[in-house]
A protein has these predicted regions:
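Conserved Class I S-adenosyl-L-methionine-dependent methyltransferase catalytic core
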Residues: 2, 6, 17-39, 68-175
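Short amphipathic alpha-helical interaction segments
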Residues: 58-69
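Conserved adenosyl
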Residues: 114-251, 256-258
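Short glycine-centered segments of the SAM/dcSAM-binding site in methyltransferase folds
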Residues: 176, 271-272
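A short glycine-rich, Lys/Arg-flanked "PGG" loop and its adjoining helix->strand segment in the class I
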Residues: 257-269
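C-terminal alpha-helical "lid/dimerization" subdomain adjacent to the S-adenosyl-L-methionine
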Residues: 276-331
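Core SAM-dependent methyltransferase catalytic element
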Residues: 332-353
Length: 353
């Protein structure tokens, strides 16, 4: 067999890039946790490692090495003439501004937390057993919220809900809403803040996430109209909901058809179900790109094991695609299904009884 040196070098280059990126993920988590990015942005000019260490009460030698790694990765800018470091506006937008729709440190916390389960998941590959979200490192839940919240804040109120038939008007007047798989409550609180005449209940099977979500509601000033309860997707209480939401969670469920059927039972006759899922095409070959790679990898470590840990274990995966999602929704009894809108990272579907 003849080795094509050009292809070999391309592959080796990709491996080295990924090796550096894998190590770099932990450094982004450190930078976010210690406020290093925010301190660089606040400085508003190039500063030395000693100045950054002083501003963040950290060790200069560690900070200097961290800065060099960041500069090598393009996450921090380096002024060679003055041996100092700074954040460009774009770098600050992505790494230091929590209000930015492109704020990404949460993605790295999610990734670092997920890979801590690799030894256990390696064994599950052999046995076929699942691995529930609740079994993962606690950092995964904060990382997931940090990763998804900027996108929700940028799109949920301004474009996703308005793309649904008649939902925005109901929410403005006063609607009864259930947010299933709410996690730490980011989506629930965002909706409650935007629609003060409506009431919201967030449901999640993870009790520790529900405790945090209640704190988020208090901190967000919406606790009087928002409640959070521990419940699973197939048995959450209540009926006659005007609006039910699923944010990036349907594909995690072992029995999504059963979960969808319960949504149908819980909705008012003129109610709407919004399903937000990761962007995906129906064919594998159309998902072989950087976004697909990120979602397939996350799905291997998180989503597929989570589904396999539950009854039925359909394991749709994070790249299920519209055709498979539609099949699940229509099989559960819904008569109406459509793609309402999309972003480069999400597909937003509307279903009605």
């Amino acid at each position: 067999m003849a080795i094509n040196e050009e292809k070999l070098n391309q592959l080796l280059g990709s491996c080295i890039t990924d090796f550096g990126a894998t190590m770099h993920a932990g450094l982004v988590v450190i930078g976010e946790s210690l406020g290093l990015y925010k301190a660089l942005a606040k400085a508003g000019k190039a500063i030395t490692p000693a100045e950054l260490a002083a501003a963040t009460e950290t060790n200069e030698r560690y900070v200097r090495e961290w800065l060099n790694a960041q500069a090598a990765g393009g996450y921090v800018s380096y002024d060679a003439d003055n041996q100092s470091y700074f954040l460009s506006e774009e770098q600050a937008f992505v790494l230091a501004d929590e209000s930015s729709p492109a704020y990404l440190p949460g993605a790295f916390l999610l990734a670092v937390s997920a890979v801590r389960a690799v030894p256990k998941l390696t064994e599950r590959f052999r046995t076929g057993e699942g691995f529930g979200w609740h079994e993962h490192d606690a950092g995964l839940f904060r990382g997931t919220e940090m990763f998804f919240r900027p996108g929700y804040a940028a799109n949920l109120i301004s474009s996703w809900i308005p793309a649904l038939d008649g939902v925005e008007e109901k929410l403005k007047t006063g609607a009864k809403v259930a947010d299933i798989g709410c996690g730490l409550g980011a989506s629930t609180v965002l909706m409650a803040q935007a629609f003060p005449n409506s009431t919201f209940t967030g449901f999640d099977y993870h009790d520790q996430s529900i405790e945090t979500a209640r704190q988020r509601a208090e901190g967000g000033g919406v606790a009087e109209r928002v409640s959070f309860e521990v419940a699973k997707a197939k048995d959450f209480p209540g009926n006659d909901y005007d609006f039910v939401t699923y944010f990036d969670c349907l594909h995690d469920m072992g029995d999504p058809v059963g979960a969808a059927a319960h949504v149908k039972e819980s909705l008012a006759s003129d109610g709407t179900w919004m399903i937000v899922e990761p962007f995906a095409h129906d064919r594998v070959e159309d998902n072989l790109n950087p976004i697909g790679r990120a979602f397939y990898s996350a799905s291997t470590l998180l989503c597929t094991p989570a589904s396999l840990s539950q009854e039925v274990g359909l394991a749709l995966g994070a790249q299920a695609g519209e055709a498979r999602i539609k099949e699940v929704i229509t099989k559960s009894g819904f008569s109406h299904f459509r793609r309402a809108t999309e972003t480069p990272f999400n597909l937003v579907y509307e279903a009605k009884p």
